[in-house]
């Protein structure tokens, strides 16, 4: 689909740590509509930084609808949507790919103790991880979060059928893929 006079318009969506923004641009770089919404970052303990995937999904739907509605009022139809999200989030998912718990964000450091133990007791593993990924072993990465989940929330880990990020969750929610 394209918009008026063949002018391509794309909606860019940026899902951040505490809010989401959507903006529609013509190929020429002219902005045609924008919206933003916010959601809370929960820090129930100094080493925890969590969010509810349902709140992020609702906020994302809200801003995309606002921008799409504004474009419709201008007689324009978006050509597509580009999605960018925060990195290193972790959501335990059930068999239907629905969240089983709040999302651990990139800022969640509850797995720091596991990382410390790995660095002390398994330096070769940490070196291999770095050589393969280009990333040092760190509490922000999903691997450390998964290990923490397995060791500290074994009942939740046992019910978890998939592990996803916020981007995975949104793609699944919007496309059922």
Question: What are the residue ranges of the model-derived segments?
Answer:
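N-terminal glycine/serine-rich phosphate-binding loop of ATP-dependent small-molecule kinases
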Residues: 1-101, 127, 131, 159
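Glycine-rich phosphate-binding/catalytic subdomain of phosphoryl-transfer
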Residues: 65-177
């Amino acid at each position: 689909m394209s918009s008026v006079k063949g002018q391509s318009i794309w909606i860019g969506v940026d899902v951040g740590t505490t809010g989401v923004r959507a903006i529609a641009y013509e190929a020429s770089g002219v902005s045609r509509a924008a919206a933003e919404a916010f959601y809370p970052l929960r820090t129930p303990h100094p080493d925890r930084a969590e969010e509810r995937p349902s709140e992020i999904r609702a906020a994302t739907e809200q801003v995309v609808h606002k921008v799409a509605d504004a474009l419709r009022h201008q007689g324009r139809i978006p050509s597509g949507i580009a999605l960018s999200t925060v990195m290193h989030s972790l959501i335990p998912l059930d068999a239907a790919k629905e969240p089983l718990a709040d999302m651990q964000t990139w800022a969640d450091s509850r797995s720091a103790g596991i990382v410390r133990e790995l660095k002390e007791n398994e330096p070769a593993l940490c070196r291999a991880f770095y050589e393969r990924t280009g990333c040092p072993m760190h509490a922000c990465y999903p691997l450390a979060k998964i290990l923490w989940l397995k060791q500290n929330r074994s009942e939740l880990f046992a019910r978890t059928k998939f592990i996803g990020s916020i981007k995975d969750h949104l793609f699944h929610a919007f496309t059922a893929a």
